[in-house]
Structure formats: C-alpha cells, structure tokens
Amino acid sequence: MAAPSMKERQACWGARDLYWRCLDDNAEDAARCQKLRSSFEASCPQQWIKYFDKRRDYLKFKEKFEAGGFQSSQSTENS
C-alpha cells in the first residue's frame, strides 16, 4: 500500500476535524454525527481511523484528568 498523497492526507485530517467538532458540539452523540463519521472513514486509511479514535479517547481522558475529574484510588493520608 502506497502512502497517501498530501491531498489525501489533508482530506483525511479535514474529515477527522469535522467529525470531532460534531462530537464536541453534540455531547459525544455519535448517532448525530453518522454522516461525518462515514465521510471520515471514506477519507482515511483504516489504520489511521483506529489511531485517531484512540487519540481522541486519550485526549478526552487527559482533559478530564487535568480538570480534576478523577480521584486517586489510593489514600495518601496514611503515607
């Protein structure tokens, strides 16, 4: 498989960005963004889609973690 051309990469990234923006605007409701998801899948290699999905999950986790949305499972009071 040949590497995607610059135009193909830009189309992929653009489709990804539109899909992610839709998810952000619709409280992660994937059903409302199905058309953009289909466009994203049609524009990007399958391996990239897997990577971008994992990347988004990580970025959302990191954002919540940094905002203090997670508590430590171990108590530090006894240390």
Curated annotation (Swiss-Prot):
It comes from the Eukaryota. Involved in the maturation of the mitochondrial respiratory chain complex IV subunit MT-CO2/COX2. Thereby, may regulate early steps of complex IV assembly. Mitochondrial respiratory chain complex IV or cytochrome c oxidase is the component of the respiratory chain that catalyzes the transfer of electrons from intermembrane space cytochrome c to molecular oxygen in the matrix and as a consequence contributes to the proton gradient involved in mitochondrial ATP synthesis. May also be required for efficient formation of respiratory supercomplexes comprised of complexes III and IV. Pfam families: COX6B. It comes from Mus musculus. A motif (Cx10C motif) lies at residues 33-44. Keywords: Disulfide bond, Mitochondrion. Coiled coil: none annotated. SUPFAM superfamilies: Cytochrome c oxidase subunit h (SSF47694). InterPro entries: COA6 (IPR042289), COX6B-like (IPR048280), CX6/COA6-like_sf (IPR036549). Residues 9-52 form the CHCH domain. Found in a complex with TMEM177, COX20, MT-CO2/COX2, COX18, SCO1 and SCO2. Interacts with COA1, MT-CO2/COX2, SCO1, SCO2 and COX20. Interacts with COX20 in a MT-CO2/COX2- and COX18-dependent manner. Interacts with COX16. Belongs to the cytochrome c oxidase subunit 6B family. It is found in: Mitochondrion; Mitochondrion intermembrane space. One of its GO terms (molecular function) is copper ion binding. A motif (Cx9C motif) lies at residues 12-22. This is Cytochrome c oxidase assembly factor 6 homolog. GO terms for biological process: mitochondrial cytochrome c oxidase assembly; respiratory chain complex IV assembly. GO terms for cellular component: mitochondrial intermembrane space; mitochondrion. Disulfide bonds join 12-44, 22-33. The keyword Disulfide bond applies.
